Amino acid sequence: MPPPPHAAFLLRSRGLLPPLLRRSPSSGPPPPLLRPTRQRRGLSVRASAAELAAGVAGVEDAVVGFVTGKRKATELAHAVWRSIVRKGDTVVDATCGNGNDTFAMLKMVADERVQGRVYGLDIQESAIASTSSFLKMAVNSHELELVKLFTICHSRMEEVVPKDFPVRLVAFNLGYLPGGDKTIITVPKTTELALQAASSIVSSGGLISVLVYIGHPGGRDELDVVESFASSLPIDTWMSCKFEMLNRPAAPVLILLYKK
């Protein structure tokens, strides 16, 4: 069931939706990010009006679902990604984990007509192995060729992502590997470096998505670093949004950084 119109209006008016989404499909031409353009190497933003409208509606539904406790932060993040990422885009999963986000990204960019790219990074070999195994079972051979996996720290993403491929999305899941060693976690120092790298490679009209898990020792310290970085971005070129459950102190926090 779609959210009631008054709920969507309330969310927009209070800044709960990123600026690019504060427009109904019937309110005229889409903003620059959503307007169909000619394809560039590594970036393809052509989409039908129906796809654009569906993307916006999907995000609004996900936001209302998150606010009412019916959707997880990961679902909200994926809904926002789908409204921004287009077939043929280049995207980066900076923390592969078990491959769920890598898989979601691949489905967003894969197209037989254009060559999308997914760069997956994780410092743990077990995470890369898990992601690789999952993808081999879940996608076809053509889609699998679009994924490049690297056992490397997320702070070194610029070493593996080609400079001539504009990046539409860089996504982080910060914390520990689900089902893995909980003592091996992302840490504030390298995460800050990774955010700096992501802000350099992401293209105009692109997004940095950061889901911070804070229920483990060190989680809140890392959240502080992410929030400090997001708050320091220049307002003329960046929009920073935060989604947080205030009465659930251990719930993950989603931070979205949109580059104008």
UniProtKB/Swiss-Prot annotation:
State the compartments where it is located. Plastid, Chloroplast
Q: Pathway, per Swiss-Prot/TrEMBL?
A: tRNA modification
- The segments labelled Disordered in the record are 20-41
Instruction: Give the chief site where it resides.
Output: plastid
The UniProt GO MF terms for this protein read: methyltransferase activity; mRNA binding
Transit peptide, residues from-to: 1-46
Write the Enzyme Commission number(s) for this entry: 2.1.1.61
Q: Gene Ontology terms, cellular component aspect? A: chloroplast
Top class in the EC scheme: transferase
Q: Which UniProt keywords apply?
A: Chloroplast, Methyltransferase, Plastid, S-adenosyl-L-methionine, Transferase, Transit peptide, tRNA processing
Catalyzed reactions per annotation? 5-aminomethyl-2-thiouridine(34) in tRNA + S-adenosyl-L-methionine = 5-methylaminomethyl-2-thiouridine(34) in tRNA + S-adenosyl-L-homocysteine + H(+)
* Sites where the protein binds S-adenosyl-L-methionine: 98, 100, 122, 124, 154
Pfam families to which the protein is assigned, alphabetical: rRNA_methylase
Q: Name one GO biological process term.
A: tRNA processing
Family assignment?
Belongs to the methyltransferase superfamily. MnmM family.
Q: What does this protein do?
A: Involved in the biosynthesis of 5-methylaminomethyl-2-thiouridine (mnm(5)s(2)U) at the wobble position (U34) in tRNA. Catalyzes the transfer of a methyl group from S-adenosyl-L-methionine to nm(5)s(2)U34 to form mnm(5)s(2)U34.
Protein name in the entry = tRNA (mnm(5)s(2)U34)-methyltransferase, chloroplastic
Q: Which organism is it from?
A: Oryza sativa subsp. japonica
